[in-house]
C-alpha cells in the first residue's frame, strides 16, 4: 500500500459507529417500532427489568435497518452508541439487551398480540394520509421465504422446489407504502383464505374511510369468487386480478387469435390486441367481465387474461392499469433487502413477529426517504442503496455534560441530503 511506511491496524478508535443512519431514526418523533412495542403485554416483574420492550423492539428494528437481521447480532451491537441513542439511551448508559433476551421476546407473543400488531400496520398506513384519499389500490402478492429447519407450518412448495413460508404482502399500489405483511404457510393461498383476509382489511379501512374507493389488484392466485361475489354488495370495492387460462377461455378468443396471427403474417410486424367478453366459471355465482390480451411476435404467441369489475373503460385501458402492479415486485425486493425472508425461529408465531419487525424496518425507511429526504436523490434510492449509503454511515459520537455531538465525515457522498434530513427531523 505504502512502500516506504509500515502499516498498523487496531480496533481502538474512540466512540465511532458504522451505523450513523440510526441517528436519523432516533430523531423520528413517533416510529412504528415504538407503537408495536406498546402493544406487547409485559408480565415481567418490573423491579428486575433492565430492558423495556420499547427499547428492545427499537433495537431490533434498528439493527434490521442496518442489515443485521439475526438476533445473534445483538451480542455485538448492544454496545454501539448510535444504536443506544436511537432507542433513547445515552452512549454512557448500560448496554442494550443480548441475544437470549431478544429471543425470549420473539417467542413471547400470543395470537391476540399478533392480531393487534397486524391492525396497527393498517392504522399506521392510514395515519400517513392527511385526509381520506378518494381511491387506493391494494396490490397483493405472496412471495417465498425459504426455510431450512423444522419450522412450524413450513411446507414443501413445488413451484419453488423448496420448503418455505409464503408471506402475503399488501402494498398501496399508488405509492409503495406497505399496508400489511402477513406470514402464511408454505402453500398457495386458497380462494376462501384470500377472501377472509382481504375482507377484514377492507372493512377495517372503510370504518375510517367509508367513501374511499378500494380496488384490489393481484395475479391469478388472488382471483377469489367469494371476493367477487362480496363486491357486488359493496359499492366502494372493485377488483382487477389475473385469470388462469383454460380451454373455454381460449375458445372465446379463437376468432380474434386467428385474425391476429393473420395480420402478423401479412405485415411482419408485432401485433397486440385487447378483447373483452363475459365469462362465468363453474364455481362463480355471476358472470364477470374478462379481458384478453393477444400478442403475436416473432417469438411466438402470448395470451393473458384478467377479470375485472371495471365495466366502464376500454379493454386496453383496464389491462394497462393492471400491468402497473408489476412495480410491486420491486417493493417486495425492497422488503427482502431487509432479509424479510429470514425465518429462523422454530415457532410460527415467532416468525410472524419477525416478519412484522422486517415490515416495521421497511415502513421506517420509507418514511425517512419520502419525508426527511424529500426532493433529494436519496428519496428514490432502493432500500439496498439506502441501507448501504445512509444507514451504514460512519459517525463519531461525543457525549458531554449538556450535549451530545454526532460528527459525520465531511467527505460523505450524501452530506447535503443528510444535512437536510437532520434539519427536517429536528424541526
Regions inferred by a protein language model and the residue ranges of each:
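An anionic, glycine-rich sequence signature occurring as long contiguous blocks
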Residues: 1-7, 11-14, 238-336, 395, ...
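Dynamic "connector" segments at or just before major functional cores
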Residues: 1-189, 193-208, 233, 369, ...
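Short amphipathic alpha-helical "interface-anchor" segments enriched in bulky aromatics
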Residues: 28, 74, 314-348, 353, ...
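Acidic/histidine-rich, metal-coordinating catalytic segments
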Residues: 141, 212-222
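Short, glycine-/Ser/Thr-/acidic-enriched flexible segments
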Residues: 143-145, 185-186, 244-246, 297, ...
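A short acidic (Asp/Glu
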Residues: 149, 224-229, 250-254
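Short, surface-exposed basic-aromatic patches at helix termini and helix-loop junctions that form
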Residues: 228-237
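Basic, amphipathic alpha-helical segments enriched in Lys/Arg and hydrophobic/aromatic residues
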Residues: 341-403
Amino acid at each position: 500500500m505504502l512502500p516506504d511506511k509500515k502499516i498498523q491496524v487496531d480496533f481502538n478508535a474512540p466512540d465511532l459507529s458504522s451505523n450513523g443512519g440510526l441517528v436519523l431514526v432516533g430523531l423520528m418523533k413517533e416510529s412504528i417500532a415504538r407503537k408495536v412495542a406498546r402493544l406487547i403485554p409485559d408480565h415481567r416483574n418490573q423491579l428486575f427489568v433492565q430492558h423495556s420492550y420499547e427499547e428492545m423492539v427499537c433495537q431490533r428494528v434498528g439493527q434490521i435497518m442496518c442489515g443485521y437481521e439475526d438476533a445473534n447480532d445483538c451480542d455485538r451491537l448492544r454496545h454501539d452508541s448510535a444504536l443506544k441513542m436511537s432507542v433513547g439511551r445515552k452512549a454512557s448508559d448500560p448496554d442494550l439487551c443480548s441475544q437470549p433476551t431478544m429471543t425470549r421476546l420473539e417467542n413471547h407473543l400470543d395470537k391476540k398480540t399478533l392480531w393487534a400488531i397486524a391492525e396497527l400496520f393498517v392504522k399506521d398506513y392510514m395515519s400517513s394520509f392527511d385526509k381520506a384519499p378518494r381511491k387506493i389500490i391494494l396490490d397483493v402478492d405472496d412471495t417465498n421465504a425459504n426455510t431450512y429447519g423444522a419450522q412450524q407450518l413450513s411446507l414443501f412448495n413445488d413451484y419453488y422446489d423448496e420448503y418455505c413460508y409464503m408471506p402475503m404482502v399488501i402494498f398501496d399500489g399508488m405509492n409503495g407504502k406497505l399496508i400489511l405483511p402477513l406470514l402464511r404457510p408454505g402453500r398457495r393461498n386458497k380462494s376462501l383464505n384470500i377472501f377472509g383476509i382481504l375482507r377484514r382489511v377492507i372493512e377495517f379501512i372503510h370504518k375510517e374511510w367509508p367513501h374511499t374507493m378500494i380496488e384490489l389488484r393481484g395475479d391469478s392466485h388472488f382471483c377469489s369468487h367469494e371476493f367477487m361475489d362480496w363486491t357486488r354488495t359493496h359499492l366502494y370495492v372493485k377488483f382487477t386480478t389475473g385469470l388462469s387460462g383454460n380451454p373455454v377461455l381460449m375458445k372465446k378468443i379463437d376468432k380474434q387469435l386467428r385474425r391476429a396471427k393473420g395480420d402478423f403474417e401479412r405485415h411482419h410486424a408485432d401485433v397486440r390486441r385487447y378483447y373483452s367478453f363475459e365469462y362465468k366459471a363453474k364455481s362463480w355465482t355471476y358472470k364477470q367481465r374478462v379481458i384478453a390480451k393477444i400478442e403475436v411476435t416473432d417469438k411466438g404467441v402470448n395470451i393473458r387474461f384478467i377479470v375485472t369489475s371495471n365495466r366502464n373503460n376500454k379493454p386496453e385501458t383496464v389491462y394497462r392499469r393492471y400491468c402497473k402492479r408489476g412495480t410491486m415486485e420491486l417493493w417486495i425486493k425492497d422488503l427482502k433487502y431487509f432479509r424479510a425472508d429470514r425465518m429462523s425461529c422454530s415457532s410460527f408465531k415467532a416468525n410472524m413477529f419477525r416478519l412484522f419487525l422486517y415490515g416495521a424496518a421497511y415502513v421506517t425507511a420509507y418514511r425517512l426517504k419520502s419525508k426527511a429526504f424529500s426532493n433529494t436523490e436519496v428519496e428514490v434510492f432502493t432500500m439496498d442503496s439506502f441501507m448501504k449509503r445512509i444507514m451504514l454511515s460512519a459517525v463519531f459520537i461525543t457525549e458531554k455534560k449538556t450535549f451530545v455531538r454526532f460528527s459525520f465525515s465531511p467527505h460523505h457522498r450524501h452530506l447535503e441530503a443528510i444535512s437536510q434530513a437532520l434539519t427536517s427531523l429536528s424541526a
